Amino acid sequence: MTSEPTDPKRQAILDGATRMFLAHGYRNVSMDKIAQAAPVSKATLYNHFDSKNALLAAVISSLCEALLQTMTQATIESDDVENNLTQIATSAVDLIYAEDALAIYRLVVAESPDFPELGQLFYQSGPQAALTQLEDYFRRLNAGGSYNIADPVFAADAFFSMLRGDLHVRCLLTKTLRPSADEKKRLVSQVIAFYMRGMLYAKS
């Protein structure tokens, strides 16, 4: 799958908005400040995004883009289920433990009591999109006749939950804590091995 050409103005706005949200939080950032940070005119900003909510949703979607592209490529281009899931898990771990992704997660949790729409916006723009793609993949495996996955919804949720686990909580609570490349690789390997034995039932 080839990604669409990036609009330089849109990307500048997303980069500026990401910097502002992470530095100042959601409530303390105005559309005027984002326009200045980009820097673009207010007219250009509103031509791309009509509200601060829409802009935050785009920031979250942008962070998730690489994972969603990997999922699409892996599940369409190859019949090797274990390899496909390894690619998806590797991309997911890179996203889950990325500094910006952790910071956005903290921001949404901190701001949600006063801006309850942020939690739903975050979920729809990030985790839900990934879950839906993986659920669809598991349903296709069932339909193909080679696998019998009893509950594709639970199976998809369990997959991403195992990649987060206690480590994700500790990284959220300790800003300096990050898994090394070897630790992430080991996490992926262990999750895939457990998953292939315990969650996906290949028909003999």
Task: Give the ranges of each region predicted by the language model.
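Short secondary-structure transition hinges
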Residues: 94-136, 177-181
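Basic, helix-initiating cap at the start of DNA-binding domains
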Residues: 1-40, 47-54, 79-80
